[in-house]
Amino acid sequence: MDDGCNSLESLIKYYPYFKDNESVQKFIIPIQPQFHEDLFPDFSNMKGSLFEKDQSLYSCQGNTIKKAYLCHSKIKTIRKGDIILFYRSKDRKSIQCMGIVEDVLFSENIDEVFPAIAKRTVYKYSDIQNILKKRTLVILFRYKALDKEISRQQIAKAEIKGNIQSIRQLSN
């Protein structure tokens, strides 16, 4: 799929397919189970349970392709078109979904951040205000579920050592 488009343009044009070559940086982002459940409800522990079809338990933003991730990481190398892999920490210790970065910003300003993430996040306005009490990394991305989960054992075989506790850039 080398059509002259960058990875973000390719994703938009060919979704669910995406570009992955040497020019595309990759990052692994740890995410705690409760936040993973909110951001990616299709991987919820409720799936297959009695309450799976109870839509009141899920926010509409959780069921979108366009999403936002907020954190206090100081990493500054993530850019538009990069691939981000979400590592569900603590319970599953695996990667089940990924995203292609649409935009990145650092801010403490609710007037700048809220319009950018309002329809992409599961957070309430008051939650966002609390998060923004210090400089926040905001990653806007397009979500893609992986066909197959990547286990912690597979991650270790890929030379990703140690506990995954902060955003890490991966080598190609």
Predicted segments, located by residue:
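Short gly/pro-enriched beta-turn/loop segments at secondary-structure junctions
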Residues: 22-24, 79-81, 94
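Short coil-to-beta transition motif at edge beta-strands of beta-rich domains
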Residues: 74-88
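Short beta-strand-centered aromatic/proline hotspots
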Residues: 95-105
